[in-house]
Amino acid sequence: MADVVYQAKLAVMRVLEKAPDAIGSVSSVATPQPHFVPTFDDGPTPGRTPDVMRALAAHDATATFFVLSTSVRANRSLLAELVAAGHEVGLHGTDHRHLSLMSPGEVRESVYAGKSELEDALGAPVRWFRPPYGDQTVSAWRQIEALGMQSVIWSSTSHDWNPFVDNDERVAKATAALKRGAIVLFHDGHASLPDGADDGPEPQLDRFDLVDRVLAGAAEQGLVGRSLGDALAAGGRLVTRAHFNLVPAPLNRRLIQRRRKATLARAAEAGLL
């Protein structure tokens, strides 16, 4: 029965993918410029965010950083460094819990608290929100919009969240998927138990090397990294699509738990725990 319900929800999700832009999340940018948008989640983090910033600076690139309140509280100076370097800051959440497992009221309370705290730290409004795991229900999306932010997902990934691949594979996959206006997912941190996440070990990788090589590959294609705000300021237009988790809550919870167990078991087998 669970599989039947799941398949039915997937069918509805495919219909929603073709829904009008008015109910969509930002997924890319239509731009006349040779720009793509590097985005970084889960920071700011000492030893990781500075490496990412060095790589961006080496290629005269800017990026959008989706930060966690749990990380910002411990690393306010890094947040200031990001802004001073010309990067853009959006909210990733007060923590890294799945919004799809929260009630609409819990989502609103959590997102409002994170937005208020981040705006106090920045002294400026926060426009962008990226749901942890990109996981949002329709009601969660409505709460985000009601709080004056736009939900931002991604069109391709660097695979830096995957502990089972190396940088050569990450770079190859990321550069192959690059195109004008793409929003690319990177990380400058790793959400863990204190952040409400339990997704296995942090991937051991050289983040400077990864970002540097992806940006170099982009340059070979005539592309340069720009934050979402910078891409829009240069004449870009937001492209949105419906991106929602429609799986019923009880089944959704079981599926998330199953994926976590599988990841942890694979990590243990690989000697990563």
Which residues fall in each region the model found?
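Alpha-helical scaffolding within the catalytic cores
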Residues: 21-24, 49-50, 72-84, 134-141, ...
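C-terminal domain-boundary segment and adjacent tail
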Residues: 20-31, 73, 196-273
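His/Asp/Glu-enriched short active-site or ligand-binding loop at hydrolase and phosphoryl-transfer sites
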Residues: 135, 141-177, 222-234, 251-255
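Active-site beta->alpha N-cap acidic-glycine motif
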Residues: 6-100, 106, 110-117, 124
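CE4/NodB-like, metal-dependent polysaccharide N-deacetylase domain
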Residues: 53-62, 88, 104-150, 170-189, ...
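A short acidic, helix-capping loop that chelates divalent metal ions and anchors anionic groups
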Residues: 97-102, 192-198
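A cross-domain feature marking catalytic cores of carbohydrate-active enzymes
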Residues: 40, 67-69, 91-93, 130-133, ...
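Short low-complexity, flexible loop/linker segments enriched in glycine and/or proline
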Residues: 79-82, 105-107, 166-169, 239-244
